[in-house]
């Protein structure tokens, strides 16, 4: 499994992908102990049909906490958020959870982009710019998270 410490954003996206995979193909869980364990967790947590594992929610919460801290201490980071925020607000307004955090919106954007690319659906240049900005933001957050947790 992807390591949360290595790249927390990729870890969350990986968990989301596994959740969708196991919902679509629950019989595939028998192929590995990792998948079997995740499917069992999904059932125990009541998210067999929709929702996210506590593992993903905790990691997202950790990213959001770091995000809030960096908004207070890193002027370039705050400027990057201010730059992307209008596009994130548009994205949020088109979801069933318009009150999601900016970090969850960035992750959702990247996850949805991955799904569109798998379906070979073209993505507009305007959207690609937002994807790039969200990726840079998550990359910075993940690197900061990694740097702070490397000693553990």
Positions of predicted regions on the chain:
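Residue-level signal for secondary-structure boundary elements
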Residues: 47-50, 68-71, 75, 96, ...
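Short, hydrophobic/amphipathic alpha-helical patches that form generic packing surfaces
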Residues: 13-20, 37-44, 65, 86, ...
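N-terminal interaction modules that seed assembly of large macromolecular complexes
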Residues: 1-50
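Glycine-rich, aromatic-bearing surface loops/beta-hairpins
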Residues: 89-152
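Residue-level recognition of alpha-helical structural elements
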Residues: 4-7, 31, 52, 73, ...
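A charged, amphipathic interaction segment
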Residues: 56-107
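Long, charge-patterned amphipathic interaction tracts in eukaryotic proteins
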Residues: 34-72
């Amino acid at each position: 499994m992807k390591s949360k410490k290595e790249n927390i954003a990729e870890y969350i996206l990986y968990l989301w992908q596994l959740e969708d995979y196991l919902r679509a193909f629950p019989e595939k869980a028998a192929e590995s102990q990792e998948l079997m364990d995740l499917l069992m967790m999904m059932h125990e947590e009541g998210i067999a049909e929709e929702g996210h594992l506590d593992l993903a929610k905790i990691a997202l919460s950790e990213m959001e906490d770091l995000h809030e801290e960096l908004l207070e201490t890193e002027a370039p980071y705050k400027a990057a958020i201010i730059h992307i925020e209008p596009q994130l607000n548009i994205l949020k307004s088109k979801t069933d959870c318009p009150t999601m955090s900016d970090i969850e919106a960035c992750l959702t954007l990247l996850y949805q982009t991955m799904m569109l690319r798998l379906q070979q659906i073209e993505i507009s240049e305007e959207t690609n710019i937002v994807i790039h900005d969200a990726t840079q933001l998550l990359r910075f957050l993940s690197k900061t998270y990694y740097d702070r947790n490397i000693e553990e």
